[in-house]
Each structure stands twice: as C-alpha cells, then as structure tokens.
From Swiss-Prot:
Subunit structure: Disulfide-bridge linked aggregates.
Claim: Transmembrane helix is one of the keywords in the record: no
Keyword Signal: yes
UniProt cross-references to InterPro entries, sorted A to Z: Bifun_inhib/LTP/seed_sf (IPR036312), Bifunc_inhib/LTP/seed_store (IPR016140), Glia_glutenin (IPR001954)
Record-given protein name: Glutenin, low molecular weight subunit
Domain of life: Eukaryota
Leader sequence segment: 1-19
Natural source organism: Triticum aestivum (Wheat)
Keyword annotations of the record: Disulfide bond, Repeat, Seed storage protein, Signal, Storage protein
Additional free-text comment from the UniProt record: Glutenins are coded by several genes on each of the group 1 chromosomes of wheat.
GO molecular function, a single term: nutrient reservoir activity
Chain residue ranges for the region called Disordered: 20-179
Length: 356
C-alpha cells in the first residue's frame, strides 16, 4: 500500500509537473513576444514583476516540499495550484501587461518622446534659429552705438580733464617735490659743524668777491679767509659723501634766510619811519579819518606774496649752490655727488654741477 501511495504521489507530481511545464512552454511566447518591449522600455519593473513569479514557479522542489504533506488531499492541491495559476498569470498579464501598454508605453511616448521634441528640439531651434538672439545682439550693437556716442564725448572730454588735471599735478605736486629738493632740511648739529663754511660763503657770496677772496687767500695764507677755508674743508671731509650736497644746500639756504630776515628788519624800520613821517605831516584835526589810510599804507608796505618770496628764495638758492659747488669741492679736494634739481635757473647762470 505504501509503495502504491508513493507511486501514486509520484504520478500526480509528474502529471502536475508536466502540466506546469506545458503551461510554462505556452506562456514564454507571450513573455518572449512581450518581454522585448518591456525589456527595451521598462526592463527594471518587468524584470522585477515577472522574473520573480517565474523563479517561484520554476522552483518546484521547495513548493513541492512545502505542499507534499497536503498531497494526500489532492483536491486542495488542484484548487490551490490551479487558481493561483489562473489568478496569478491571467491577472498579471491582464493587469500588468495591459496597463503598461496603456499607462507605461503611451505616456513614455507622450511624455518622454514628445516633450523632448518639444523641449529639446524646439527651444534650441527657437534659441539658435530664431532671431531674438540676433535681435538682442543687434539691439546690443544698436545700444553700443549710443554708448559709444555717449562714451566718446567723455573720451573727448577726458583729454581736457587730463589737461586740466595735469597742470594742477604739475603745479601742486612737482613744485613741492622740487621744493623738498631745493629747500633742504638738515639737523642743527650739521649746521653747527659746517658753520665755518657758512661764514666763508656769507663773506664771499658774490662770484667777483669770491674770486678776490681766493686770490687774497693765495696771497695771504694766514688771513681769516684762509683759516675759515681750512676749517670748512676739515668739517666737510668728515661728512659722508652722500649727504655733502644736501648739507651744502642747507648752509646756503640758512644764509638766504638770514639775508631775508635782515631785509625784513630793514623794511620794518623803513615802514616805521614812513608812518612817523606821515603822522607828522597830517593835521591832528582829521582824527579817525587818518587811521584808515595809515592801515592801507601798512598793508601795502607789508604785502609780499609768499609765492614770489619762495620763487626768489629758490632762484637765490640755485645760484649760490652753483657757485659753492664750483668752489668748495675743488678747494677742499672733496667728492660731491651729482644732485639734479627740477627748477629753472635764470639765464646767464650755468649750473655745472658734476661729480668732483
């Protein structure tokens, strides 16, 4: 009996396997006919949805092992196996295949193909072939022309601006720079050190007088001029070579300032004398009416523009430095480096300054 039951079960299992194989052989054409579009268009979902059931259907030994105990109940096996095949395959092909064609294929053609043609092709053709960019470029060119027309006047106006700005730079920057070169600033210790040179140059600031002094110094070696000359040369040699030129200019500038102070004192004395004479000449009855012309006279006598004073100082400085640089280096056998100045010297006075 047991062997008969075993053979019967084996026969049933073989029959069910043959039925399943026949059904599977009939199903692949549908899957082969319908899988390529799904594999081409929707491979991931179709492979996930259909391969899993086929793998479950092909793996019969576990299914047979799980359902071998209920093989004794043949009707449930047919009821359990047949309905799933009818319910699993037909709904899958009806629900999974038909909707994909209607929902998955049609939308891709409508969403994937049509939008690309509408979004990818039409915009590029509209952007590349349409005339708005050309019109924008033409508008930009048309706008650039007014910009060039608007910018050309500033460019044409900029040269006068540069012409207007350059003179102030020449007037504001260069003179101070030249003044910084021309009006030297040196420590009082150096001035004290070169005081003999200052005294020597104060006595002989005129070229003719300097030549006379040099002649006298040659004739009378023990004179005051010769003593001051020796002291000046000694002090000048102690100063570094780079600062010798500036120190000489500083000495000359101090001489010019002393001369101006003396001139101002003389002018003030003359002004005071003229005011006293004017007051003595005017009658006392005029009272306050006399005070106004007196103030005007004081202002007229005291007014001297600073620019004229500076120009006069610079001219004197250049003339006297040229004379000093001709005499002192040769007299003391001292090297004085070249020092360029930007100011113009009056005609007839040559500045032959070089490296001695």
């Amino acid at each position: 009996m047991k062997t008969f039951l075993v053979f019967a079960l084996l026969a049933l299992a073989a029959a069910s396997a043959v039925a399943q194989i026949s059904q599977q052989q009939q199903a692949p054409p549908f899957s082969q006919q319908q899988q390529p579009p799904f594999s081409q268009q929707q491979q991931p979902p179709f492979s996930q949805q259909q391969q899993s059931p086929f793998s479950q259907q092909q793996q019969q030994p576990p299914f047979a092992q799980q359902q071998q105990p209920p093989f004794s109940q043949q009707p449930p096996i047919s009821q359990q196996q047949q309905p799933p095949f009818s319910q699993q395959q037909q709904p899958q092909f009806s629900q999974q295949q038909q909707p994909p064609y209607s929902q998955q294929q049609q939308p891709p053609y409508s969403q994937q193909q049509q939008p690309p043609f509408s979004q990818q092709q039409q915009p590029p053709f509209s952007q590349q072939q349409q005339q708005p960019p050309f019109t924008q470029q033409q508008q930009q060119q048309q706008q650039q022309q007014p910009f060039t027309q608007q910018q050309q006047p500033p460019f044409s106006q900029q040269p006068p601006i540069s012409q207007q700005q350059q003179p102030p730079f020449l007037q504001q920057q260069r003179p101070p720079f030249s003044r910084q070169q021309q009006i030297p600033v040196i420590h009082p210790s150096v001035l004290q050190q070169l005081n003999p040179c200052k005294v020597f140059l104060q006595q002989q600031c005129i070229p003719v007088a300097m030549q006379r002094c040099l002649a006298r110094s040659q004739m009378l070696q023990q004179s005051i001029c010769h003593v001051m000359q020796q002291q000046c040369c000694q002090q000048l040699r102690q100063i570094p070579e780079q600062s010798r030129h500036e120190s000489i200019r500083a000495i000359i500038y101090s001489i010019i300032l002393q001369q101006q102070q003396q001139q101002q004192q003389q002018q003030q004395q003359q002004q005071g004398q003229s005011i006293i004479q004017y007051q003595q000449q005017q009658p006392q009855q005029l009272g306050q009416c006399v005070s106004q012309p007196l103030q005007q006279l004081q202002q007229q006598l005291g007014q001297q523009p600073q620019q004229q004073q500076l120009a006069h100082q610079i001219a004197q400085l250049e003339v006297m430095t040229s004379i000093a640089l001709r005499t002192l280096p040769t007299m003391c056998n001292v090297n004085v480096p070249l020092y360029e100045t930007t100011t113009s010297v009056p005609l007839g006075v040559g500045i032959g300054v070089g490296v001695y």
